[in-house]
């Protein structure tokens, strides 16, 4: 529902666009869900985040004149069409307003939530004249991770090219790969890794999917909190488990990425999107597994 509204399309437009083979899914599942969701919002006299953006855009277009000298936008690589229209409505009523956006197309991993990377890559096409300033120093990690991840990302020539440098030439972040096999092999390997780490160090366990935590057997205690957080303990060591998407922006002394295997539920994910989603999502990159590479 929010993807449909984020793209600025109505149910009628969706009906007219769908191909015959997708019509049963759209008319039998999607449209009834959207209509029931809208009905529920009316009953509770509530709006969601996308509603708030759409309503604010309509207010500006109908004559409301917000008086801003500067508009600052963070995480611009995640911008969606509804947010783009909102920014344009703010600028339209006050043309001298300066728009300052910070983003990194190497971190664009939320297409499934409605983001449209073309708005970032073709900024001047959508917003007019601009000046681009590059920030190429990272304070999160050092080499060899910086060099290896840069080469990995830039294999996709559609990514903006830049030379990322660590904040200090002495900063070091190592990458190690471990093979496992057989039932319980993953859990045993993780236990071996943990036993070699300093006791007072922080550790994150990450997976491409939330179900990856199940690869840890009975040697690990897994607790699912009411807030959705997953806590894992092994002996006296307590750790957080989360998906790679949930971990974005966080830091830890050590990070263990589980189940880097091939297959449908591996990393990269080989699960194909439903063709129905193409009606409400932006166009994907042409490079194979482009978003999965950025997630990794």
Task: Kindly give the residue locations of the regions a language model identified.
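N-terminal accessory segments
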Residues: 1-29
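Conserved helicase NTPase motor core
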Residues: 19-122, 137, 249
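Conserved helicase core region in the C-terminal RecA-like lobe
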Residues: 71-75, 102, 226-265, 295
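Short glycine-/polar-rich loops that comprise or flank the Walker A/P-loop
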Residues: 95-97, 104-106, 127-132, 171-173, ...
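Conserved coupling/interface region of RecA-like P-loop/ASCE motor cores
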Residues: 107-166
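Inter-lobe coupling/hinge region of RecA-like P-loop helicase motors
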Residues: 130-137, 158-207, 239
